[in-house]
Regions:
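Acidic donor-binding loop of glycosyltransferase active sites
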Residues: 112-126, 139
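Short hydrophobic beta-strand element within catalytic cores of glycosyltransferases
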Residues: 136, 140-143, 153
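Short acidic/histidine- and often glycine-rich active-site loop of Leloir-type glycosyltransferases
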Residues: 145-156, 160-163
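C-terminal "capping" alpha-helix adjacent to the active site of nucleotide-linked donor transferases
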Residues: 160-182
Length: 239
């Protein structure tokens, strides 16, 4: 069966699979509005509380550099003990704020007002939606070189990629100084939902070429996907 990967990194552990293309995830351009002059004065962690997601490393970098850290994350039942025993003790003090899980609307303000997103993972992340969500808000990313990070973050343009926590601490000022307008532009160029949909259509058409069937009769007509349109469309998700 033909498969589509969400990053080239995702192919590494499944090299015998019939992967015919890589299509990066995308977001509607109007889902998050960018903030070019953030006033929050904090670093952001967005995701899930688990050992591989690196919230403890984000805490270490933030405290070493002396910048507050806000953590918007869910705690799955399987990770409750890890959160209680390893993370909760780190969250004492005015410089750290645990917000919990947030919705899409809250993400815009949370990420937009942040100086940078901390993406200090310790596993081969196949994509990492929070990175492009931050970019949509104009917020640069500080990330460890794992999994798909090098495919998503353009080093020196939409963020910086590092190889250690020590390097992350030294690099943080350069991340915060990046041009937020350029970060948003690159998000629009590379990670729109329209681009993603059109790439899937091209893949599907290429698989159907032997039957002379086209999935989209007029390929010249672009697909337009906005947050409002998605809200009105029924959808199915595979988890």
């Amino acid at each position: 069966m033909p498969l589509v990967s969400i990053s080239d990194a995702q192919r590494v552990p499944i090299q015998n699979a019939n992967v015919v293309a890589t299509v990066y995830h995308g977001l509607p351009l109007d889902l998050h509005q960018p903030t070019f002059n953030p006033r929050g004065g904090y670093l952001a962690f967005l995701g899930r509380i688990s050992p591989e997601k690196g919230v403890d490393r984000a805490v270490k970098v933030a405290r070493t550099f002396g910048i507050p850290l806000k953590i918007a994350a869910k705690v799955d039942r399987v990770d409750e003990a890890y959160f209680r025993e390893q993370i909760a003790p780190l969250l004492k003090g005015p410089d750290l704020q645990f917000i919990g899980e947030i919705d899409e609307q809250e993400k815009t303000d949370f990420l937009g007002q942040a100086l940078a997103l901390m993406f200090l993972i310790d596993w081969p992340e196949p994509f990492g939606m929070s990175m492009i969500e931050a970019m949509a808000c104009g917020t640069p990313v500080l990330a460890l070189r794992r999994g798909s990070v090098e495919e998503v973050v353009e080093d020196g343009l939409t963020g910086h990629i590092v190889d250690s926590i020590e390097e992350a601490t030294v690099t943080l000022p350069r991340v915060m100084a990046l041009d937020r307008r350029a970060v948003r532009r690159r998000f629009e160029d590379r990670f729109s939902a329209t681009r993603m949909a059109n790439e899937y259509v091209r893949v599907y058409n290429s698989l159907l070429v032997r039957t002379n069937v086209k999935l989209v009769p007029n390929q010249a007509e672009p697909l337009h996907t906005t947050a409002a349109e998605l809200a009105n469309e029924p959808s199915e998700s595979i988890h």
